[in-house]
Structure formats: structure tokens, C-alpha cells
Amino acid sequence: MPKVGIIYNDIKPVAGRVAIELKDKLTTAGWDVSITSSIGGILGYSNPESPVCHTPIDGLTPPGFDSEMKFAIVLGGDGTVLAASRQVAPCGIPILAINTGHMGFLTETYLNQLPQAIDQAIAGEYEIEERAMLTVKVLRGESVLWEALCLNEMVLHREPLTSMCHFEIAVGRHAPVDIAADGVIVSTPTGSTAYSLSAGGPVVTPGVPALQLVPICPHSLASRALVFPDTEPVNIYPVNIPRLVMVVDGNGGCYIFPEDRVYLERSPYSVKFIRLQPPEFFRILREKLGWGLPHIAKPTSVELP
């Protein structure tokens, strides 16, 4: 009996309703269906009294989800896709993402096209697009305090009502650099259209084997986004602030103290997205972000009073 998974956003009633209907339909068609919510992929939130809420990377995989599963259907928006990616990437399960959210930059199709999408996926009429992920670790000495998979970005920033931060950052074997800013972002190509883009980073197409380091509100005109090979690991040391906040994929994270360091490297895992038509990144940029659209015609003269 073939296996399929369903991961849905349990905050959205429509996603939960469709998930139950889809489970019944696929079970009747002879599939072994495992269903879970994306809450299992949400990283624990810490607090000053308990600064680290640690779940091992392979500890997020839901019951019934394994490498024998043909694919997993994700019902939600981009946040649901990010959470689901952490749940299934260690098992290599492909994701068919159905948008029930807002922008749906990472999703493949919309809810009104669900029946056709399921039929096409069951028939195997699709391509797989792999997206690189990061492994993020918080180390104190050689002990791992916290770790997570990251599809978009890791953000390290100051708390409200605190002063500017200094970060000592070492990329690969290169000499460390000091960056003064409100925070720093380390982003994958997938994350280059998210927080990194808003902070002034470039758009990087998904197939480029690169990472980028983007300062947030830097205190220097010379501190600009840096793109470098994803074979280079990154170590970040806080210098002058008693406590920093780290957030992964806008989802959760932990506090970072002066005795800690944040270590990032390209993960051995990747997210496998089911594409029902050949992936066209520039089309998505146009449709979702308005990139490259023609300028609106403007009048050549203005009549003043």
C-alpha cells in the first residue's frame, strides 16, 4: 500500500477541513495516509529564565512519516511550508505545497486546483526541485545547546531598548570581521526573497550554491551584503551585548549569550518540492513580488494651478 502524508496549518479552519476530506479520499483510493499539523515543525520559543528550548533536528519528524512515503501534501502558506520542511527533510519526503495562506511564494498551486494537483502527483507527472538548507547550531565550548534546520534564514539581533551590537564573524578560513549593526542575517538562496531582501540583500536564484550574509541597519556605509560559496561554514560571536535573540525562519529560536557562538553550514538535507510544471523562478518573482514589470505610463507634463 503506497504511503502519503498530509501536513496542515491547524490555525486555519479551511486547511483542517480540507486535510480531513483529503485523508478520507486517499484512504478510500487505497493509500496509507498519515496526517499531522505543522505545529510539530515549529521550533520552541525560549525565555530569559529558560534561554534554550532544544529539539534535535531529527526529532521533528512526525509519526508515520519515513523514507517510504511517496510525498507529503502541505496545506497552508509559506510559514506552514517552512515548518513542514523541517519535519520531512531528514526523511527526503517530497512536498506538494497547496496555498491556503496569503502570498504563497513557496507553494506550488492553489486550493481550487487541488483535485488536479493530487491526480497529477499520484500519476507521477511532476519534477522535483531541491532547495538547499542550513544547519544552525548554538555552541558553548564544544557542547551543542540548540540546533535546527533552516530553509530561509537565520537572524541574530539585539533585543528592544538595547544598544547597537558588534558581531565578530568568520566565514570559512578567512580572517574574522567585525560588523556593527542591529543584527545580521545568514540566508540561503530560497531566503534571499524574504527578510534578507527587505534588509537590502540581493535576490539569488535557487540553483546557485551560495549563502549570503546581510547586516541589519549597519553602522557603516561599507557594511554591505556578502555572497559567498555555501561550502564555507560561518561562525558568529557576540561581542558587546549581554544577550541576543536568534530566530530561524521567522519561527522560533533561543537567546545567545557572550559565551556562545552560532555555527552555520550547508545542511546535508534539502527540501524536495514537487513541481507540476517546469519551475520558472523569474515568473514567480513577477507574479508574487512584481519584479521586472513594465513601468506604469505617466503623464509627460503636469498642469500647475
Curated annotation (Swiss-Prot):
Catalytic activity, EC: 2.7.1.23
Identification of the protein by name: NAD kinase 2
Swiss-Prot/TrEMBL catalytic activity: NAD(+) + ATP = ADP + NADP(+) + H(+)
One GO MF term attached to the UniProt entry: ATP binding
Keyword terms, alphabetized: ATP-binding, Cytoplasm, Kinase, NAD, NADP, Nucleotide-binding, Transferase
Similarity annotation: Belongs to the NAD kinase family.
Enzyme type, top EC level: transferase
Pfam families in the record: NAD_kinase, NAD_kinase_C
Top-rank taxon, per record: Bacteria
Predominant location category: cytoplasm
InterPro entries noted in UniProt: ATP-NAD_kinase_N, ATP-NAD_kinase_PpnK-typ_C, NAD/diacylglycerol_kinase_sf, NADK
Biological role stated in the UniProt entry: Involved in the regulation of the intracellular balance of NAD and NADP, and is a key enzyme in the biosynthesis of NADP. Catalyzes specifically the phosphorylation on 2'-hydroxyl of the adenosine moiety of NAD to yield NADP.
Enzyme active site: D78 (proton acceptor)
UniProt xrefs under SUPFAM superfamilies: NAD kinase/diacylglycerol kinase-like
Subcellular location: Cytoplasm
Keyword flag Kinase: yes
Lineage: Bacteria, Bacillati, Cyanobacteriota, Cyanophyceae, Nostocales
GO terms under cellular component: cytoplasm
Binding site for NAD(+): D78, G79, N152, E153, D182, T193, A194, Y195, S196, L197, S198, N251
Record Gene3D superfamilies: Probable inorganic polyphosphate/atp-NAD kinase, domain 1 (3.40.50.10330), Probable inorganic polyphosphate/atp-NAD kinase, domain 2 (2.60.200.30)
Cofactors required: a divalent metal cation
One example of a Gene Ontology biological process annotation: NAD metabolic process
